[in-house]
């Protein structure tokens, strides 16, 4: 994901392209004769506009979210305090710390205790199809993020900056499942020694 300075530069560059693409789309809608031309104008305008608005959004959000990183550090410390004597260190790493998750968190934090439509979150990712999955991954870490659907519209709300440490065993279990460093039997033994159910 681009940094804040490059996002501002990209926004000014892409804004003109988006204006042109939307103009072509409006023209195709007004003078609709060939369905294929209309569809092509729409898909192009959608792609260019998504990239332009992503740049504008990332220029608006902080380039580095210290609270996001502090919460990750809290989760990491809690994992280590519980399991460092029984679980290998490479399974005690906090996932989902990349720029995409950080950007989504920044937008949700900006609207703390307020509903945010999934469509707004998709601006952060350039309308990526996996945006809502990335948001739900924040919930897997124990972030106080709630989801509901209203009139078939997905709504997300970060209700506080508290963490639910009860989800830490599931983080370790998921890390073990994804790891290629251990056999299936080794993973079972690691989880058993840590007192973490294999299924959950």
Predicted regions span which residues?
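Short amphipathic alpha-helical interaction segments
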Residues: 126-140, 148-150
């Amino acid at each position: 994901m681009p940094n804040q300075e490059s996002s501002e530069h990209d926004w000014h560059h892409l804004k003109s392209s988006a204006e042109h693409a939307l103009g072509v789309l409006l023209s195709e809608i007004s003078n609709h004769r060939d369905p294929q031309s209309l569809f092509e104008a729409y898909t192009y305008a959608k792609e260019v506009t998504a990239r332009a608005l992503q740049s504008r959004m990332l220029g608006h959000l902080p380039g580095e979210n210290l609270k996001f990183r502090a919460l990750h550090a809290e989760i990491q410390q809690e994992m280590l305090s519980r399991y460092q004597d029984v679980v290998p260190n490479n399974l005690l790493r906090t996932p989902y710390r990349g720029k995409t998750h950080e950007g989504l968190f920044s937008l949700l934090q900006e609207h703390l205790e307020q509903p945010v439509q999934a469509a707004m979150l998709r601006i952060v990712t350039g309308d990526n199809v996996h945006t809502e999955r990335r948001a739900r991954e924040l919930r897997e870490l124990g972030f106080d993020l709630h989801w509901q659907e209203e009139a078939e519209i997905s709504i997300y709300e970060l209700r506080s900056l508290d963490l639910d440490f009860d989800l830490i065993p599931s983080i370790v279990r998921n890390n073990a499942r994804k790891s290629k460093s251990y056999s299936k039997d080794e993973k079972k033994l690691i989880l058993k020694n840590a007192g973490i159910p294999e299924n959950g």
